Amino acid sequence: MLAPLFAALLAGAATASPIQERQSSVPVGTIITACTVPNTFALTFDDGPFAYTSELLDLLSSNGVKATFFLNGQNWGSIYDYTSVVTRMDAEGHQIGSHTWSHADLATLDAAGITSQMTQLETALTSILGKVPTYMRPPYFSTNALALSTLGGLGYHVINANIDTLDYEHDDDTIGVAFTNFQNGLASGGTVSLMHDVHAQTVHVLVQEAINAIKAKGLTPVTVGTCLGDASANWYKSGGGSGTTPPPATGGPSPDDTCGGSNGYVCQNSQCCSQWGWCGTTSEYCAAGCQAAYGPCT
């Protein structure tokens, strides 16, 4: 009975599904650390998109592997500078989740601050994909009762991991230590791993070794949603998320530092789009009136 179910889940994960009313059995506002579908494993990557993410997508494609990316809006880079990478993730059947707008420690924020961190990224993903994720990972795995309650109220499944490779400590010739951490977690029955696609050695060395080890153990690397038995239609909700839906950014990268308005241009190089439709980086552009659909706002 499990084989047909698993095959159906894989088929659903590999193709885009229309947004529809969600009927997920995966709980919201509760920390989840492990897969529930037998013989599956979820590779997850945090903190991107960044310079190495495209290479990682190439690697996953060459291995026939689907993964989950928990994205920030403004962290190592601005999500608006990597819109083509984000759309490629989605088109190739990977799962996109939220990692908050700016990698904030949610346990240090009040409900309004938590909501702001989530809805800022929802606005960005609405402009890029026309939809927002229902899965998220708290930065630092840090939550408290208020954070979980707020995230649950926003409809988010909260995903941690039971294998932390600590790859961020080994982005050099000690990357083998991160793989040892991975192997130890895998041997202990871990099924959800944490890595970061912002580190060169993770992408160039660690991921391939991890894929080899997963397959050698007879497990299938899949998205978090698939490993929890959740149909791909449930991984997202309609664009606009928990706040007001801005018009989608349709004009592409700005060629002349204009943005929004009738042209729909998106500011590049981490510039904000001011209320007057110009790209810049000072408070006049990034604070009051900033148009979050066309660049980051602070």
Curated annotation (Swiss-Prot):
A Pfam family of the record is Chitin_bind_1
Catalyses which reaction(s): [(1->4)-N-acetyl-beta-D-glucosaminyl](n) + n H2O = chitosan + n acetate
Q: Per the annotation, which location comes first and is thus the protein's main one?
A: secreted
Characterize the pH dependence.
Optimum pH is 8.
EC number per UniProt? 3.5.1.41
Q: Where in the cell is it found?
A: Secreted
Temperature dependence of the activity comes to:
Optimum temperature is 55 degrees Celsius.
All copies of domain Chitin-binding type-1, residue ranges: 256-298
Obligatory cofactor(s)? Co(2+)
- Give GO MF terms, alphabetically: chitin binding; chitin deacetylase activity; metal ion binding
Q: Name one GO cellular component term.
A: extracellular region
Disulphide bonds annotated for this chain are 259-273, 267-279, 272-286, 290-297
Q: Quote the record's binding site residues for acetate.
A: 46, 140
Keywords (alphabetical) are: Carbohydrate metabolism, Cell wall biogenesis/degradation, Chitin degradation, Chitin-binding, Cobalt, Disulfide bond, Hydrolase, Metal-binding, Polysaccharide degradation, Secreted, Signal, Virulence
Q: Where is the signal peptide?
A: 1-16
- In terms of superkingdom, the source organism counts as Eukaryota
Annotated ranges, domain NodB homology: 39-222
Family of this protein:
Belongs to the polysaccharide deacetylase family.
Name of the protein in its database record: Chitin deacetylase
Q: Which species is this UniProt entry from?
A: Pestalotiopsis sp
**Organism lineage string:** Eukaryota, Fungi, Dikarya, Ascomycota, Pezizomycotina
Protein's gene: CDA
